[in-house]
Structure formats: C-alpha cells, structure tokens
UniProtKB/Swiss-Prot annotation:
Site entry: Important for catalytic activity for the proton relay mechanism but does not participate directly in the coordination of zinc atom: D148
Natural source organism: Shewanella pealeana (strain ATCC 700345 / ANG-SQ1)
EC class (word): oxidoreductase
Keywords: Cytoplasm, Metal-binding, NAD, Oxidoreductase, Zinc
Name of the protein: L-threonine 3-dehydrogenase
Entry keyword annotation includes RNA-binding: no
Length: 341
C-alpha cells in the first residue's frame, strides 16, 4: 500500500510501499479517504530536537484522518463494515489509575498514532475499535479529517465557562483559530487572538475573532482599551508555546482569571509567579482530547451551526504530498488536506 514514512533521520518525508497492517481481535481496519497535516507532522518532517528524541525511524506518520471501516477483529462490537470513522490518536493502556477511573486522556502510558506507532498517512490504518468515532452523516469528510486538532481546540476552549467572558488566545495557528470560533459560538463577549503571522490573523477574523492583533505592530493593552475592557481578560488560552506570549497573557489577565495551556514551550520557561499568586490565577494544562466527551461535543458544535470550514485552505492528492508539506511549512495556510481516493 502507499504510505508516507519517516524513512531516514533527516529532513523530509518519503512515499513508500508498505505492507498492509494486520488486524487484531479488538481492532478496526480503516481504508483512509482523507488525511490532514498537523504541526506535529511538520516537526517530524523538519526532524527537530523533539522528533529526534521521540520518533522511531522508519515509521509511517500522520494522525489526522477520516476513512471507512473495511475489516474488524472477531471481538469488535458496535461497528459494521462501511462505517465512516475518524479516531482518537492517543492509544491508552486501559489499566492505569486514570484509565480505570474514566480519565483516559490522562493515561500515563499513552502511545500516539503516527508518533509512537504506525500512523494514518497510508491507504490503510489499524486502530483499537475503542479509539474509533463514528462520523454523523451530516458532517463532511473534510471536517471529519480535522477532528483531532479541532478536538484540541474544543478541549482547551471549553475548559472554563465562556458565556459573557472576555477571552485572550495567544497563538493563531489552526488550533488557536478554531478555538476562537468555538469561543464566539458558545457565547464569549470579546475574543482577542494574538500572533505575528498576518495570513493567519486574517483567517482568525474570518472565523469570528473580535480582534486579531499582530503584536509586532499593535499593543495589546491599547486593543483592550479600544474594546472598552477595564479589568483584563477572564479566560486565557495559550496556544503558542512562546514565552513572550504567555508573559503578555499574565500581564493582561483579570484577577481570578483562568488559563488553559495547550502550546508546548521549546524549553524551560521562566515566569513571574508573583503575578499568578497575587492575581489568584488558575492554570490548567491541556493534552489531547477528553475521551470521548470532546468528540461528542465536536460533532454537536458543528451540528448546531459552528462553521470551521474556512480553516481548510488547501487540498492536494496524496501524490502531491510534498506541495502540502511545503504549504504547511510556509505558514501561509490553514489546514492542508491530502486526498487518498
């Protein structure tokens, strides 16, 4: 079968002919229709320090996808051949305290599809049936293929009450932009998103952000004054992993504010903890998606009228995968879809 693999410990991704994966007793065999390129895949392509310390070589990569069930193990229940599915990319152990307590997204033994085990950039993928999510008929393949990053946005955004609140999002990558759309959809008052990438800031405004702020050109506190804000942001969503962005968030949060952090800093990050203490801030780390509450919320948000389709800006056939990666690496894109049909 065709597959995209990290063949060598150097920059790049390569098309290979890989063996079709074998199906275990509790597994689904999924024929892939569409995949999306994640920022993680770009890290793997670039072969940065994180990738060098994490990714086994060679390995098929990718973890954002939609496909059709074409085979299943003898113990599988609840699925039928032909079901359209996406899937949770975090494979959990099922026996640690958090798994047994129903907090599977906090499994200490998590294995990532396309990160620690064979991924979805292939004609076929095998995952445990537990990890599969049936896609409702009224949700398109394009949207279903980005449920993984959309889930990161939903999990982060819905960590705290947003109704009538003022929200600051630092980092206008695709996940930050989708989070802005979620915040507006569920009733936030002002949603301000910051970055230095003009293309993505414009995309954020199309997706519903009240103000998209290029912090290289504008002062965030001036924008707050322009919006009539007098006490600071109630909720912060840190999506960038950039220390200066987080410092700006701490400066502009209201007392008693709440921060959800999804962005991963490149190294140790020093902050002024006195601001956290004296402002009484709550900081919550976010990893992945809640299984499977986030998935049901994703489907419900779309079915209730949330439109995230503008975040998908490029489509390529799988044979044009290099152009897809080039688009993602340029920063002049939203989500990039690779078609396998």
């Amino acid at each position: 079968m065709k597959a995209l693999s990290k063949l060598k410990p150097e920059e790049g991704i390569w098309m290979v002919d890989a063996p079709k994966p074998e199906v275990g007793h509790n597994d689904l065999l999924i024929k892939i229709r569409k995949t999306a390129i994640c920022g993680t895949d770009v890290h793997i392509y670039n072969w940065d320090e994180w990738s060098q310390n994490t990714i086994p070589v060679p390995m098929v990569v990718g973890h954002e996808y939609v496909g059709e069930v074409v085979g299943m193990g003898q113990e599988v229940r609840g699925f039928t051949i032909g079901d359209r599915v996406s899937g949770e990319g975090h494979i959990t152990c099922g026996h640690c305290r958090n798994c047994r307590g129903g907090r599977t997204h906090l499994c200490r033994n998590t294995s990532g599809v396309g990160v620690n085990r064979e991924g979805a950039f292939a004609e076929y993928l095998v995952i445990p049936a537990f990890n599969a999510f049936k896609i409702p008929d009224d949700i398109s393949d394009d949207l279903a293929s980005i449920f993984d990053p959309f889930g990161n946005a939903v999990h982060t955004a819905l960590s705290f009450d947003l109704v009538g609140e003022d929200v600051l999002i630092t980092g206008a990558g695709p996940i930050g932009i989708m989070a802005a759309a979620v915040c507006r959809h569920v009733g936030a008052r002002h949603v301000v998103i910051t970055d230095v990438n003009e293309y993505r800031l414009e995309l954020a405004e199309k997706m519903g952000a009240t103000r998209a702020v290029n912090v290289a050109k504008e002062n965030l506190e001036d924008v707050m004054q322009e919006l009539g804000m007098t006490e600071g942001f109630d909720v912060g969503l840190e999506m960038s992993g950039v220390p200066s962005a987080f410092h700006s968030m701490l400066d502009t949060m209201n007392h008693g504010g709440k921060i959800a952090m999804l962005g991963i800093p490149g190294g140790d990050m020093a902050i002024d903890w006195s601001k956290v203490i004296f402002k009484g801030l709550i900081i919550k780390g976010i990893y992945g998606r809640e299984m499977f509450e986030t998935w049901y919320k994703m489907a419900s948000l779309i079915q209730s009228g949330l439109d995230i389709s503008p975040i998908i800006t490029h489509h390529y056939s799988i044979d044009e995968f290099q152009q897809g990666f080039d688009a993602m690496r340029s920063g002049q894109s939203g989500k990039v879809i690779l078609n396998w049909d």
